[in-house]
C-alpha cells in the first residue's frame, strides 16, 4: 500500500439501451424502469449510504469544467491521430469527433443514481426523451481524495487494449468500454454525478458520467476513420 496513493479503484461501464418519452415514468428501457421514476428527483444520499460520512454531493463548477475539458482534450487527441497507444496502436485519426458540452439533465439523472450508493452497479434506465444514454463509472479511494481528473484518466488509459480494426465485441468490451464511450464520435453531451465521502478512514470519490447520444454499440467502431 502506498501512502497518499490510490488504495483501490473500480471502474465499470454500461452498454446502452434505447427508448423514447417525455415523462420519466413513461420512458421505457429493455431492462427496467427509469432511475428518476423509481427514486424521484431528490439527490439526497439514500439510506444505502448509511455508515459513510458524505462530504459533498455532485461535482463542483470547477470539476464540471474539468470533466468537459478533459474529455474534449482526449477526444481531439484521438481525432487528430495523435494517440499512439493501442493493441495495436496508433489509433487512426477520426473525422466525426464532436466536442462535448455539459448537459444538466444528464447530470441530474447521474446524481440521482450516484446518491443511491449502489456502488459498482449501473442503473437500468437513464435515457432522456432526446436520446439513449450511455454511462461510465469510476470509484476510487485512498489516504488522499482522488481528484476527478485521475478518475477520468482510468477510462482514457483503456486505449492501450483497444484494436480499432476489431471494434467493440463482447470479448473485449470489459477492457475497453470506458475508452470507447469517451471517444464515441457521435456523442455530443455529458453530465456527471458524484459523491465524496469518508469510510473506514479512507477518502473516497465516486463518479458517474452519462453520455448522450450513447455510444458502445456492439459490432460498431467508436468513430469514423479519417
Curated annotation (Swiss-Prot):
Domain SCP: 69-211
Subcellular location: Secreted
Gene3D superfamilies: CAP
Record bears the keyword Secreted: yes
Main subcellular location of this protein, as a coarse class: secreted
GO cellular component, one term: extracellular region
Tissue note: Expressed by the venom gland.
Pfam families according to UniProt: CAP
Signal peptide stretch: 1-21
Keywords carried by this UniProt record: Allergen, Disulfide bond, Secreted, Signal
Tree of life domain: Eukaryota
Cystine connections: 25-37, 29-125, 49-117, 192-209
PANTHER family, A to Z: CYSTEINE-RICH SECRETORY PROTEIN-RELATED
Protein family (similarity comment): Belongs to the CRISP family. Venom allergen 5-like subfamily.
Protein name per the record: Venom allergen 5
Amino acid at each position: 500500500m502506498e501512502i497518499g496513493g490510490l488504495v483501490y479503484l473500480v471502474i465499470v461501464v454500461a452498454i446502452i439501451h434505447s427508448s423514447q418519452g417525455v415523462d420519466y415514468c413513461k420512458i421505457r428501457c429493455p431492462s427496467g424502469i427509469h432511475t428518476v421514476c423509481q427514486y424521484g428527483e431528490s439527490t439526497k444520499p439514500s439510506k444505502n449510504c448509511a455508515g459513510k460520512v458524505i462530504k459533498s454531493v455532485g461535482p463542483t463548477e470547477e470539476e464540471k469544467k474539468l470533466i468537459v475539458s478533459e474529455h474534449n482534450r482526449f477526444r481531439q487527441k484521438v481525432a487528430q491521430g495523435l494517440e499512439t497507444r493501442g493493441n495495436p496502436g496508433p489509433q487512426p485519426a477520426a473525422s466525426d469527433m464532436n466536442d462535448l458540452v455539459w448537459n444538466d439533465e444528464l447530470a441530474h439523472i447521474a446524481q440521482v443514481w450516484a446518491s443511491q450508493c449502489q456502488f459498482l452497479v449501473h442503473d437500468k434506465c437513464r435515457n432522456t426523451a432526446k436520446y439513449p444514454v450511455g454511462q461510465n463509472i469510476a470509484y476510487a479511494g485512498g489516504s488522499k481524495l482522488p481528484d476527478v481528473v485521475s478518475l477520468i484518466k482510468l477510462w482514457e488509459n483503456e486505449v492501450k487494449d483497444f484494436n480499432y480494426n476489431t471494434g467493440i465485441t463482447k470479448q473485449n468490451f470489459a477492457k475497453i468500454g470506458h475508452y470507447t464511450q469517451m471517444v464515441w464520435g457521435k456523442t455530443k453531451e455529458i453530465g456527471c454525478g458524484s459523491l465524496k465521502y469518508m469510510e473506514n478512514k479512507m477518502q473516497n470519490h465516486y463518479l458517474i458520467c452519462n453520455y448522450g447520444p450513447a455510444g458502445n454499440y456492439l459490432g460498431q467502431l467508436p468513430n469514423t476513420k479519417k
